[in-house]
Swiss-Prot record:
This is tRNA pseudouridine synthase A. Keywords: Isomerase, tRNA processing. HAMAP family: TruA. Gene3D superfamilies: Pseudouridine synthase I, catalytic domain, C-terminal subdomain, Pseudouridine synthase I, catalytic domain, N-terminal subdomain.
């Protein structure tokens, strides 16, 4: 039996999330259907992180166990032949038995792409979040970036946890949080050990409230300390949320995540300011 890891990219707007559902309109369902067509047998997958409906992935990782002997590119080419245009296998690699897509991961990175202005941008529908503002007004990116820094470190993130979250503990570690502005765009990058259900979208709801001037930057710390979902802003839309990368120990030698997206290219250079 061989364990195979696959790197997956998908447009979440086309699906009802990652996890398999009876109606079959999920990323897991179409991926496993494609694997079954390619391999001729059912190949259940285990994913690094389940994404919600409308959430995209640039660097999702899954593993599967199989008795089939195929070279890595055969897994890529063969599976992609049966996938819709909204999903693609980017790489495949044979892994040791102790590799686990979820439990071996020590870091996950999410991006959020947000645009603002007097009207929505139809060509970005499903690909970016949006905030409608009167002409001449903008989001306060500096305040948003300042507010996000309170989230760094190990904290109880109950205030940002969905009611239906199944995680055993609300305590997670955030390694970095960054907010950058480019014209009528705001980009957010959050890196952490793991995330609760709706956690990033609930954080975004608070950041948007701060960016619009409805709350001061210090409010984020109050929300975090409250450990109460009712203290935070409403859950923000999924459209602009991307699972950008899943990090593993170097010993596994997994391929680097592909160039994430033209939306984010160059945004988070080390010396860029808010």
């Amino acid at each position: 039996m061989t364990r195979i890891a696959l790197g997956i990219q998908y447009d979440g707007a086309a699906f009802s999330g990652w996890q398999s559902q009876p109606h079959g309109n999920t990323v897991q369902d179409v991926l496993e259907a494609a694997l079954r067509e390619f391999a001729g047998v059912a190949l259940p997958t285990t994913v690094a992180g389940r994404t919600d409906a409308g959430v995209h992935a640039l660097g999702q990782v899954v593993h599967l166990d199989t008795e089939l002997v195929r070279d890595p590119f055969s897994w890529v080419r063969g599976t992609n032949a049966f996938l819709p245009p909204t999903v693609a296998v980017r790489w495949a690699q044979a892994m040791p038995e102790d590799f686990h897509a979820r439990f071996s991961a020590h870091r996950r990175t999410y991006y959020y792409a947000l645009t603002y202005g007097p009207t929505r941008a139809p060509l970005l529908e499903g690909k970016a979040g949006y905030v409608t503002l009167p002409p001449g007004q903008s989001l306060d990116v500096t305040a948003m970036h300042e507010a996000a820094q309170v989230l760094v470190g190990e904290h109880d993130f109950s205030s940002f946890r969905a009611a239906e979250c199944q995680a055993k503990s609300p305590v997670k570690t955030m390694y970095s949080t960054e907010v950058r502005g480019q014209g009528e765009w705001v980009f957010v990058r959050i890196r952490g050990s793991a995330f609760l259900h709706h956690m990033v979208r609930n954080i975004m709801g608070c950041l948007v409230a701060i960016g619009r001037g409805k709350r001061p930057a210090a409010w984020m710390g109050e929300v975090l300390a409250a450990r109460d979902r009712k203290a935070a802003a409403p859950t923000f839309m999924p459209d602009g949320l991307y699972l950008a990368e899943v990090g593993y120990p170097d010993a596994f030698r997994l391929p680097a995540s592909p160039a994430s997206s033209s939306l984010f290219r160059g945004v988070f250079d080390e010396h860029a300011g808010p």
